[in-house]
Amino acid sequence: MSDWKSMSKDELELQYSPSRWSPRMSADDVIRAHVSALKSGTERARSVTQTLMDVPYGEAEGEKLDVYLPSSSSPDVPLVIYFHGGYWQFLSKDESGFLAVPLVQKGAVVVAVGYSIAPKGDMDLMVSQVRRSVVSVIQQYSHISGLYLCGHSAGAHLAAMVLSTDWTQYDVSPKIKGAFLVSGIYDLQPILSTYVNEPLKMTEEVALRNSPSRFLSQLKVSSASCDITVAVAQNDSPEFRKQSEEYYKALESAGLKVSFEDVSETDHFSIIEQLVDENYLLTKLLLKMIGKS
């Protein structure tokens, strides 16, 4: 496949427009259906689990978490932090509890993280926020059996940036046991000239310092024992698939514990929507990762 640098702006825009690659429905319809699926899944999770809503992890208005709790607490409770997608400019924690039910039913705590999406927040701020959210969670839940991250699309990018954090600056060491990176972007340079960057206003310098693909040595120091799954949809665009494949290969070459899942019969949206289903491949893999299969 040709290098993104040789693509026209139109081709890059197409490659980085996930909704235009779904075989299920039109671009507008797939986004509408996605939002609807996330909202209804989150409403269900809120109705069947115990919740703590809008827990602050910082001073800013957008710095809040939603926590989904199992009905009985046992000593070995894994905690899964979810970072939502939406190209850093859409969606929020308020539709991000949909994956909680199968996890909470097995005794896990699920935390959905809010962050200041563009144009309110910029990329540096969002990366700082998700890092601080993890610090706050470990301080609040020191008794957990393990901390795990899950992120979709832009959220997978943010999760990968968390894995690449120099924690000495935060006086903590989270010891993240596992990370589930679903249909993410790990090199931000290709989107600089696309519509995606219009509200983000990233310069090349900002894109480079927030590209996980450039921080493998830090990830190796911070997250050496982390079990990482890189997942991609069969009907993700070739560029999205390439982002996941190349990041997976780089992690593997760096000697990290990483596996690759190419999920058949999914697109960029259904690959994450189906986490509501305990029998879905990725749900089973996530439950296995957190020791609750």
Curated annotation (Swiss-Prot):
Family matches, as Pfam families: Abhydrolase_3 (PF07859)
Active-site residue list: 153, 236, 268
Signal peptide range: none
Keyword Hydrolase: yes
Record-linked SUPFAM superfamilies: alpha/beta-Hydrolases (SSF53474)
Enzyme class per UniProt: hydrolase
Domain notes: The main chain amide nitrogen atoms of the second glycine and its adjacent residue in the HGGXW motif define the oxyanion hole, and stabilize the oxyanion that forms during the nucleophilic attack by the catalytic serine during substrate cleavage.
Complex formation: Homodimer.
Protein's name according to its UniProt entry: Kynurenine formamidase
Species of the source: Danio rerio (Zebrafish)
Organism lineage string: Eukaryota, Metazoa, Chordata, Craniata, Vertebrata
Chain's gene name: afmid
